[in-house]
Swiss-Prot record:
The lineage of its organism: Eukaryota, Fungi, Dikarya, Ascomycota, Pezizomycotina. Belongs to the peptidase M28 family. M28E subfamily. GO terms for molecular function: aminopeptidase activity; metal ion binding; metalloexopeptidase activity. The gene is LAP1. This is Leucine aminopeptidase 1. InterPro entries: M28_fam (IPR045175), Peptidase_M28 (IPR007484).
Length: 385
C-alpha cells in the first residue's frame, strides 16, 4: 500500500540541509516501488531497503529498529541529513530546593490509576479504532490537567496524521521561543498480529506516557512556569506510530524543521516501569541513560539531574539506531537524549505481547523517572540555552 505523504520538508527554503550520508544509495526519479505495496526503511546510516509491511513486522520481531522513510521517498528528498544544533547545557543544577519541593507531590497512585485505564484499550495500534479512541482519551486527560491548573496560555493540540491516531503536543509558553521538549509514544503493538491481537502496552510505552503526564501536572504547580515567566517554552509530546518506524515523531520534527522551530533539547521517556530484569540479575535499581546516537552535552547534563533529583543511580547503556522517538529529533538536527528503565539488556521482554501488563510494573521505579523528567524540564526551562 502507498503511505500518504507525512512530511512537508520545504527543501528549497531550508538552509540547514547538508551533504547526504556517504555511500547512501540514491533514490531515482520514480518511486514505483511504493505503489507495489512496499515501504522504504533505514536500518542505519546508509542502510536502506524496500520492504513489505509484513517484512517490517518481521524485522521488529527480530529486534531490529528503523526509520520508515517512505514519505521522504514520496517527496523525492532522500537521502539527506541536517546540521546538528549546538547547545551549551548548564554545568550545575540551579533549582534543587524548588524542584525537590515540587517533586514531593508526584503521585504513584495517579500513575497506576492512569495506566489501568490506558491499558484497557484493546490495542493502541496506530491504525486501529481503539488506537484512535485511546488518543482521544489521553488528549482529554491532558486537557483536564491544564484546565485545572492556573497556567496562563498553556494549551494542548492534536497533531494530525493520515492514519487514525493523532500525536499530541502540550505547550507551556515561556518568555522566548527557545523550546525544551520531553516525549513518549502513546501507541502499542502486538507484533504477532498487530491489527488483531491485544496490546496492553503497559511498559511500552504506557509507562513513559504516564511518566511525562505526571511530570506535566506537577510542573504546572510552579507559579513561575504556569504564568509564563520561565525564559524558555516547554512542550510535552505524545507520539503516534512509534512502533511502525517513528512515523509520528518524524512528522512532528519535520514540521518543526520546516517552521524553523528553535528546539534546544528533546528527552524521550520510553519504557520507564520495569525493574525486575535489573533485580533478577543481582544489580541495584537504576535508570539507564542511553549513550549512542544521542547528544553528548544533553546526556551529560541528564546524569547530573539523576544524581541530584532521583533516589536511585544510573547506568550507561546503548540501544542502537532509531530505537525510539528521540532519534527523530536528532534526525532533524535537534539535541536529543533517551532514558530507559534499566541497562538495555535488562529491560522488559514482555513488550509487544499480551503480557505487557500493569502487574509487571514497579511504580516506585517509575516515580524516579518522573522526578528526573520534572527536574530536567524545570532546570532547562530556566537555563540560558
Amino acid at each position: 500500500m502507498k503511505l500518504p505523504s507525512l512530511l512537508s520538508l520545504g527543501v528549497a527554503a531550508s538552509t540547514t540541509i547538508v551533504a547526504a550520508v556517504p555511500d547512501q544509495k540514491p533514490i531515482g526519479d520514480t518511486i514505483e516501488d511504493v505503489h507495489l505495496g512496499k515501504f522504504l526503511i533505514e536500518l542505519g546510516p546508509g542502510d536502506t531497503r524496500w520492504v513489505t509491511e509484513e517484512e517490517k513486522w518481521g524485522l521488529r520481531r527480530d529486534g531490529r529498529r528503523f526509520f520508515d522513510i517512505t514519505a521522504e521517498a514520496e517527496q523525492n528528498v532522500f537521502p539527506k541529513t541536517f546540521a546538528q544544533t549546538t547547545v551549551t547545557f548548564p554545568s550545575e543544577l540551579q533549582n534543587v530546593a524548588h524542584v525537590k519541593k515540587l517533586a514531593s507531590s508526584l503521585s504513584k497512585n495517579r500513575l497506576q490509576t492512569f495506566l489501568t485505564k490506558f491499558t484497557s484499550f484493546h490495542t493502541r495500534y496506530y491504525k486501529s479504532e481503539s488506537g484512535r479512541q485511546s488518543a482521544i482519551w489521553l488528549f482529554e486527560q491532558i486537557e483536564k490537567i491544564i484546565q485545572e491548573s492556573s497556567a496562563t496560555g498553556a494549551r494542548v493540540e492534536k497533531f494530525e496524521h493520515p492514519w487514525g491516531q493523532f500525536s499530541i503536543i502540550a505547550t507551556i509558553p515561556g518568555q522566548t521561543n527557545k523550546t525544551v521538549v520531553v516525549g513518549a509514544h502513546q501507541d502499542s503493538i502486538n507484533l504477532l498480529m498487530p491489527s488483531i491481537l491485544p496490546a496492553p502496552g503497559a511498559d511500552d510505552d504506557g509507562s513513559g506516557t504516564a511518566t511525562i503526564l505526571e511530570a506535566l501536572r506537577i510542573l504546572l504547580k510552579s507559579e513561575a512556569v504556569a504564568q509564563g515567566k520561565a525564559p524558555n517554552t516547554v512542550e510535552f509530546h505524545w507520539y503516534s506510530a512509534e512502533e511502525a518506524g517513528l512515523l509520528g515523531s518524524q512528522a512532528v520534527f519535520a514540521q518543526y524543521k520546516q517552521d524553523n522551530r528553535d528546539v534546544k533539547s528533546m528527552l524521550q521517556q520510553d519504557m520507564t516501569g520495569y525493574s525486575k530484569g535489573t533485580m533478577n540479575a543481582g544489580h541495584v535499581d537504576s535508570v539507564g541513560i542511553i549513550t549512542d546516537f544521542v547528544d553528548e552535552g544533553l546526556t551529560n547534563f541528564i546524569t547530573k539531574v539523576v544524581t541530584g533529583y532521583c533516589g536511585i543511580s544510573y547506568v550507561l547503556t546503548k540501544c542502537g539506531y532509531a530505537c525510539s522517538d528521540h532519534a527523530s529529533a536528532s534526525r532533524y538536527g535537534y539535541p536529543s537524549a533517551f532514558v530507559i528503565e534499566s541497562k538495555f539488556e535488562y529491560s522488559s521482554k514482555l513488550i509487544h505481547t499480551t503480557r505487557d501488563e500493569v502487574s509487571s510494573l514497579d511504580f516506585d521505579h517509575m516515580l524516579q523517572h518522573a522526578k528526573m523528567t520534572l527536574g530536567l524540564v524545570y532546570e532547562l526551562a530556566f537555563a540560558d540555552l
